[in-house]
Amino acid sequence: MATFSQKPAEVVKKWVLIDAEDLVVGRLASLVANRLRGKHKATFTPHVDDGDNVIIINADKVVLTGKKYTDKKYYWHTGHPGGIKERTARQILEGRFPERVLEKAIERMIPRGPLGRRQMKNLRVYAGPNHQHEAQQPEVLDVAALNRKNKGNA
């Protein structure tokens, strides 16, 4: 029997809705990254975008374990000499775009390259409880019920 290799035309994508309220960032990001890549499917093929479309709501209510809320730093560089900047997870979560903490965690778990960028386009993250994808009839995935450690103690 030959190894199965899926073609892009054969891909069937589902829509999945996840409520991130009180969920641990890293555990949620790991699960979502696998969903976006399609590794949860028996038809997984490394060079094909086989993952599901994932919608995450309440991304502003995620939980960071330990002292990461105050101590974890996100760095970027402006491109100018001495242009290294940093911001803590607390500053981002209390700032204008709190969903970026979760987006960055997921983005850094996806392989870099053209396929990874395409798979990241299948992710929609919203800070509040509302989203505009009701027409896709997303299937609700209860991440907290999968493992007791997925839910934060907050």
From Swiss-Prot:
Keywords: Ribonucleoprotein, Ribosomal protein. One of its GO terms (cellular component) is cytosolic large ribosomal subunit. Disulfide bonds: none annotated. Transmembrane segments: none annotated. InterPro entries: Ribosomal_uL13, Ribosomal_uL13_bac-type, Ribosomal_uL13_sf. GO terms for molecular function: mRNA binding; structural constituent of ribosome. GO terms for biological process: negative regulation of translation; translation. Pfam families: Ribosomal_L13. Coiled coil: none annotated. Part of the 50S ribosomal subunit. Belongs to the universal ribosomal protein uL13 family. This protein is one of the early assembly proteins of the 50S ribosomal subunit, although it is not seen to bind rRNA by itself. It is important during the early stages of 50S assembly. This is Large ribosomal subunit protein uL13. It comes from Brucella canis (strain ATCC 23365 / NCTC 10854 / RM-666). The gene is rplM.
